[in-house]
């Protein structure tokens, strides 16, 4: 899940300076769970903007906000309302904001800051467990990711700065390498890990921007 945090309303207003009419775009998935762009938040944003003298020509909650085909379909339905707007205020992640721009051709303003790929611990509580590095080593580290959960991104063991099992950089967090050590010991994989070569990450496997085309779709395109 992509974790987002709503920008301060004053910042949103500043980005809309000089624009009278806006169309709102939400997301039914990640932004809904994060309470930054579901139907409830879109309606609240509409009311707040109208209180500030803005005209909201319409709104839509895409399912999801990062699907280009879905965005094009819904934008066609709202063609008139979008045409009346000076810009779109997009209440999803950065990917969704860029999809909205591509699908509409309009100026877009992000209402949220995109933070990380997160897991849901409980309602309203999210944690970053994966950095989408493109070279997963969870099978080697007991299902715990050092690349993400170590602030220094160390892949060859702890830095030596941990104190009482806590991270040197953020003492509120447990040292992930101590967690990995304990987990590998628990599942009987510690000796195997210590005897294996140090993993060297290949940063070339995940360069920006990335693209993935599923083989069946690639074959279909090649046959056209």
State where each predicted segment sits.
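N-terminal glycine-rich "phosphate-gripper" loop used for MgATP/nucleotide binding
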Residues: 90-94
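ATP-dependent adenylate-handling ligase core
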Residues: 66-68
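Short, well-ordered alpha-helical microsegments
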Residues: 96-98
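Iron-sulfur (Fe-S) cluster-binding modules
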Residues: 1-63, 75-88, 102-140, 144-224
């Amino acid at each position: 899940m992509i974790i987002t945090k709503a920008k301060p309303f004053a910042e949103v207003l500043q980005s809309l300076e000089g624009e009278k009419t806006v169309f709102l775009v939400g997301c039914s998935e990640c932004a809904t769970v994060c309470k930054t762009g579901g139907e409830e938040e879109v309606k609240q944003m509409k009311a707040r903007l109208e209180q500030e003298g803005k005209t909201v020509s319409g709104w839509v909650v895409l399912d999801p906000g990062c699907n280009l085909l879905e965005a094009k379909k819904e934008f066609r339905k709202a063609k008139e309302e979008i045409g009346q707007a000076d810009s779109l205020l997009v209440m999803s992640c950065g990917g969704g904001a860029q999809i909205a721009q591509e699908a509409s051709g309009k100026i877009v303003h992000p209402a949220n800051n995109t933070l990380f790929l997160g897991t849901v611990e409980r309602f309203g509580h999210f944690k970053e467990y994966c950095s989408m590095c493109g070279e997963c080593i969870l099978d080697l580290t007991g299902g715990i990711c050092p690349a993400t959960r170590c602030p220094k991104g160390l892949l060859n063991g702890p830095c030596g700065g941990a104190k009482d099992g806590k991270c040197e950089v953020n003492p509120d967090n447990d040292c992930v390498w101590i967690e990995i050590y304990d987990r590998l010991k628990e599942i009987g994989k510690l000796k195997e890990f210590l005897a294996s070569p140090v993993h060297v990450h290949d940063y070339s496997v995940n360069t920006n921007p990335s693209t993935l085309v599923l083989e069946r779709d690639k074959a279909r395109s090649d046959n056209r």
